């Protein structure tokens, strides 16, 4: 017993009066961690179960998406741990190249007025490590608050020495196999940060722009079918005209097909460029002629490759017009196929100034046909905040096609399963059309590319410079410089499942826990992370027979968490909810400061302030971790986006209270009493037999839900059993026994109370760990359990022998009868405590048996002064009636209600509902409201209308019943 958490008072006879998560959660977590309960049990004869947390950015702090995914992961880990498996849940953080570099750059700019260039590369990187030491642990501290049962001693960081070695090893081996190469290709270029960025870091914004229609004169006296001596091309980026190397028309287009193979003379530069036939030109769109700029547009780049067009780069890395262009062939080699001259008037211009200058020149030459307003999608860098340029640069690439083939087969043959299954199609569509992966970034923070150059520009790849010199016989007199670039962070996180277990060493951890069991991830990174992990892992990890090993057997995909109106949570919308604010509570002032302080766009602050004050007039109450986890589990319908609902959170906080109070009731009736654990005769009441049957059916359904990743169903099953069956019915049904049962009956009921509550706590533990451990520590002694923690107790198993079908059907009938009486009380406005006379008319043999065997139960729970079975043919007095299976329930009304008063009350209630129905119908009939209001608001009004109509119908039926008395 020495391991009982110190804050649990062992001598106190019962639980504290009120459930206070703030007092129990943190001390309990510290106790669990200190005792080492989160570590694998080390029993390699047992099946192992392993989850790797998707590494959050080291710069980050916990948001709702993390809380959601980590609740699911912890629920799975606790569930599997309780089944005796050797479980490892491993956490870590990602070095987050660009994000971390920017955080530290902003910090030194604000505090010291310096840039990273003032520091120099090595000193700046030292500065980042220093920052990581001070601030990098925020997210892991917050993860502990969620109750995450992570083995913290195995925490990893993507720039750890071990992981850095694995990254080098992978790079060197892929390069040896010709699966990594350096090439000149088009990338997303951020001119502000001066680096290539991934598609995930590009934010496409809708904007109003222009479409310029420009005339390109035909060469050699050629004419169009309409007799014109020029083609008109439409473009949204006139500045790129300087880099055009062709004009495409559709080969089927009757207007232009005779011109294919002829040339136009490019205005401003006088370059002769070919007219090509290509499907890329759409006859229906614009003029049907498309200018082709292979060095500055992703589609044009593909067209250029198909037709072997040279590529002309006209921009510097800052996004300005170059003083002379760079001309390359389709392989990225320099060529003199075209002149590299750029007219002097455009040289050095910033790209948007160049746009204006080019348009002005076309107008001056009489070659501007027209300008039309145009809605367009513009790519912005999500961190630099400037327009992204497709840019021709030298980068390192992974040749993905051979890796993708194996990774596709792993999903096709079921080695990896997606939950929900529809995400497999998304995976296939991307993998079957996969492009080579640009893995280099022009940053300082990250894994530096293990490649060196000599003065002639030869490239050598190796694990370090010494290896490069040794393998290539390069003496000390040969000067080498290392590649300045670093690797895309997705490259190192792509090795996450095996590098964190010690690869390339063949460690015991790798043998025990790889492949891992499941990965829980958002669908937005299915390509960036999931697909790349599958490709890289299967290439490097092989089983003892040399067969490629998958990184995980199941991919559980989550949707996004949105606000209550279905909007994406973002700082600029001011609708972000911090999960820890729901756990600990936050005042309105602090919440406003959080939402409006340090805003990138301060002009939005007032709108956000108003919205927040309306939504949270008193701030947010503390709800505790368990209520947050329960809500997240309950909302986790597979793969769909979730609209966050504060009312659900309150409901699950109430659930925790209900469980606490029910446990107090059980303890008050069992502590210090004979609960049958020492033998002695036990008689189980119908209610005892019924709750055991209900509970076993609950275990079965709950396990099925957990085994199929239906956490929403599991949470619903747990809620329904605990609240409705156990608390509302069973605890009430024990009261007649407690008041007047025999010793054997008392023993039976106490024994059942303890048995069901103790197992229910184990059932609920994976979702709500804190409250269940706290209560279990009190209940375990009554069951004679000496173990230290619920975490390592066996998970409840379904026992068919406990399912007494007769008890289930008998008690269901009794419940229906009691509900019938309660409904009549409510409809007739009769006080709940007023004893009633009740009669049963036309009862069949089954109903009669049930009444005779359980009369005291029924009378006690329905608050009856008498319960009479009417003889056959006896109609009984004037009564309000309800049908139950095999009988009719009668409550004589004589002396119970004043008919006139009651009818008057009902008429007033109907009138009130009529007014409300009219108000809502008016609102929904207003087209402006329906069109402008958020979808969720309109849906709420429609639900309210349906509820009012239903309530009105019920009142009308009651009026008819009373009028007939």
Curated annotation (Swiss-Prot):
Which residue stretches, if any, does this entry annotate as coiled coil? 896-965
Uppermost EC category = ligase
Record key words, sorted: Aminoacyl-tRNA synthetase, ATP-binding, Coiled coil, Cytoplasm, Ligase, Nucleotide-binding, Protein biosynthesis
Segments for region (Disordered): 1-22
Entry annotated with the keyword Membrane? no
The residue numbers the entry assigns to motif 'KMSKS' region are 568-572
* Entry's EC annotation: 6.1.1.9
Q: Which GO terms describe its cellular component?
A: cytosol
Q: Which residues cross the membrane?
A: none
A Gene Ontology biological process noted in the UniProt record is:
valyl-tRNA aminoacylation
Matching PROSITE patterns, A to Z?
AA_TRNA_LIGASE_I (PS00178)
Please name the Pfam families in this protein's record.
Anticodon_1, tRNA-synt_1, Val_tRNA-synt_C
Spell out the reaction equation it catalyses: tRNA(Val) + L-valine + ATP = L-valyl-tRNA(Val) + AMP + diphosphate
Binding positions for ATP? Answer: 571
Q: Where is this motif: 'HIGH' region?
A: 56-66
Single GO molecular function: ATP binding
Cellular compartment(s): Cytoplasm
PANTHER family the record matches: VALINE--TRNA LIGASE, CHLOROPLASTIC_MITOCHONDRIAL 2, VALYL-TRNA SYNTHETASES
Question: What remark about domains does the record contain?
Answer: ValRS has two distinct active sites: one for aminoacylation and one for editing. The misactivated threonine is translocated from the active site to the editing site. The C-terminal coiled-coil domain is crucial for aminoacylation activity.
Q: Which family does it belong to?
A: Belongs to the class-I aminoacyl-tRNA synthetase family. ValS type 1 subfamily.
Assembly and partners are described as: Monomer.
According to its UniProt entry, what is the function of this protein?
Catalyzes the attachment of valine to tRNA(Val). As ValRS can inadvertently accommodate and process structurally similar amino acids such as threonine, to avoid such errors, it has a 'posttransfer' editing activity that hydrolyzes mischarged Thr-tRNA(Val) in a tRNA-dependent manner.
Q: What is this protein called?
A: Valine--tRNA ligase
In which organism is this protein found?
Yersinia pseudotuberculosis serotype I (strain IP32953)
């Amino acid at each position: 017993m020495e391991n009982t958490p110190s804050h649990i008072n062992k001598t106190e006879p019962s639980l504290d009066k009120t459930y206070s998560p703030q007092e129990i959660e943190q001390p309990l977590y510290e106790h669990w961690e200190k005792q080492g309960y989160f570590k694998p049990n080390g029993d390699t004869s047992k099946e192992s179960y392993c989850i790797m947390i998707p590494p959050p950015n080291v710069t980050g702090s916990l948001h709702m998406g993390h809380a959601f995914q980590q609740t699911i992961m912890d629920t799975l880990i606790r569930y599997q741990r309780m089944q005796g498996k050797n479980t490892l849940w491993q956490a870590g953080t990602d070095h987050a190249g660009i994000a971390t570099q920017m955080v530290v750059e902003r910090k030194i700019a604000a505090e010291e007025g310096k840039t990273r260039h003032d520091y120099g590369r090595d000193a700046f990187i030292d500065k980042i490590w220093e920052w990581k030491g001070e601030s990098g642990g925020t997210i892991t501290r917050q993860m502990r608050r969620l109750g995450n049962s992570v083995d913290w001693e195995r925490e990893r960081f993507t720039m750890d020495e071990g992981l850095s070695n694995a990254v080098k090893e992978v790079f060197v081996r892929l390069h040896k196999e010709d699966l990594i190469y350096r090439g000149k290709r088009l990338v997303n270029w951020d001119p502000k940060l001066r680096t290539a960025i991934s598609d995930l870091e590009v934010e496409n914004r809708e904007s109003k722009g222009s479409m310029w229609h420009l005339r390109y004169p035909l060469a050699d006296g050629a004419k169009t079918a309409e007799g014109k001596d020029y083609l008109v091309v439409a473009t949204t980026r006139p500045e790129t005209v300087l880099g055009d190397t062709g004009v495409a028309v559709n080969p089927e287009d009757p207007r232009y097909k005779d011109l294919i193979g002829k040339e136009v003379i490019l205005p401003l530069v006088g370059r002769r460029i070919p007219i090509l036939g290509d499907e890329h030109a759409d006859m229906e769109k614009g003029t049907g002629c498309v200018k082709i700029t292979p060095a500055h547009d992703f589609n044009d780049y593909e067209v250029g490759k198909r037709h072997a067009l040279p590529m002309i780069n006209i921009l510097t890395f800052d996004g300005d017009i170059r003083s002379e262009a760079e001309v390359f062939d389709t392989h990225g080699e320099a060529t003199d196929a075209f002149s590299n001259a750029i007219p002097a008037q455009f040289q050095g211009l910033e790209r948007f100034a160049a746009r204006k200058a080019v348009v002005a020149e076309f107008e001056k030459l009489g070659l501007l046909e027209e300008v039309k307003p145009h809605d367009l999608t513009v790519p912005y860098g999500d961190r630099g905040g400037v327009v992204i340029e497709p840019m021709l640069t030298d980068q390192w690439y992974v040749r993905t096609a051979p890796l993708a083939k194996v990774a596709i087969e792993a999903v096709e043959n079921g080695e990896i399963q997606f939950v929900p299954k529809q995400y497999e199609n998304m995976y296939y569509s991307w993998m079957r059309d996969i492009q080579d992966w640009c893995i280099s970034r022009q940053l300082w923070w990250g894994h530096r590319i293990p490649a060196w150059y000599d003065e002639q520009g030869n490239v050598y790849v190796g694990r370090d410079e010494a290896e490069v010199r040794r393998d290539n016989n390069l003496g000390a007199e040969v000067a080498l410089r290392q590649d300045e670039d670093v690797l895309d962070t997705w490259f190192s996180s792509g090795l996450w499942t095996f590098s964190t277990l010690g690869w390339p060493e063949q460690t015991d951890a790798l043998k025990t826990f790889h492949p891992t069991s499941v990965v829980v991830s958002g669908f937005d990174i299915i390509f960036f992370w999931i697909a790349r992990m599958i490709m890289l892992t299967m290439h490097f990890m092989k089983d003892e027979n040399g067969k490629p090993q998958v990184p995980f057997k199941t991919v559980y995909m989550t949707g996004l968490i949105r606000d209550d109106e279905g909007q994406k949570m973002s700082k600029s919308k001011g609708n972000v909810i911090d999960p820890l604010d729901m756990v600990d509570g936050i005042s309105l002032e602090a919440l406003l400061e959080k939402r409006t302080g340090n805003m990138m766009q301060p002009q939005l602050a007032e709108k956000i302030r108003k919205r927040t004050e309306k939504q949270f007039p008193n701030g947010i109450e503390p709800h505790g971790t368990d209520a947050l986890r329960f809500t997240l589990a309950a909302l986790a319908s597979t793969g769909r986006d979730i609209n966050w609902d504060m009312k659900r959170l309150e409901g699950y906080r109430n659930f925790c209270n209900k469980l606490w109070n029910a446990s107090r009731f059980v303890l008050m009736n069992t502590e210090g009493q004979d609960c049958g654990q020492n033998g002695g005769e036990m008689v189980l009441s119908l209610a005892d037999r019924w709750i055991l049957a209900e509970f076993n059916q609950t275990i079965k359904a709950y396990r099925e839900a957990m085994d199929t990743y239906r956490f929403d169903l599991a949470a619903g099953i747990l809620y329904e059993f605990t609240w409705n069956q156990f608390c509302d019915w069973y605890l009430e049904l024990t009261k007649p026994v407690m008041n007047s049962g025999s010793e054997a009956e008392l023993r039976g009921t106490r024994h059942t109370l303890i048995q069901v509550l103790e197992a229910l706590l184990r059932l609920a533990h994976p979702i709500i760990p804190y409250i269940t451990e706290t209560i279990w520590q009190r209940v375990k002694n009554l069951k004679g359990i000496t173990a230290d923690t619920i975490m390592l107790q066996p998970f409840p198993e379904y026992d068919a022998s406990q399912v007494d079908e007769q008890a289930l059907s008998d008690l269901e009938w009794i419940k229906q009868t009691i509900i019938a009486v309660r409904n009549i009380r409510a409809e007739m406005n009769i006080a709940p405590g007023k004893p009633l006379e009740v009669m049963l008319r036309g009862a069949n043999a089954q109903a009669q048996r049930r009444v005779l065997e359980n009369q005291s139960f029924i009378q006690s729970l329905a608050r009856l002064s008498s319960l009479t079975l009417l003889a056959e043919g006896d109609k009984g007095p004037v009564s309000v009636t309800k049908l139950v299976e095999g009988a009719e329930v009668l409550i004589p009304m004589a002396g119970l209600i004043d008919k006139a008063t009651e009818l008057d009350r009902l008429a007033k209630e109907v009138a009130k509902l009529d007014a409300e129905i009219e108000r809502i119908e008016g609102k929904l009939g207003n087209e402006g409201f329906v069109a402008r209001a958020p979808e969720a608001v309109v849906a709420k009004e429609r639900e309210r209308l349906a509820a009012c109509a239903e309530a009105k119908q019920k009142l009308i039926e009651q009026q008819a019943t009373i009028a007939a008395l």
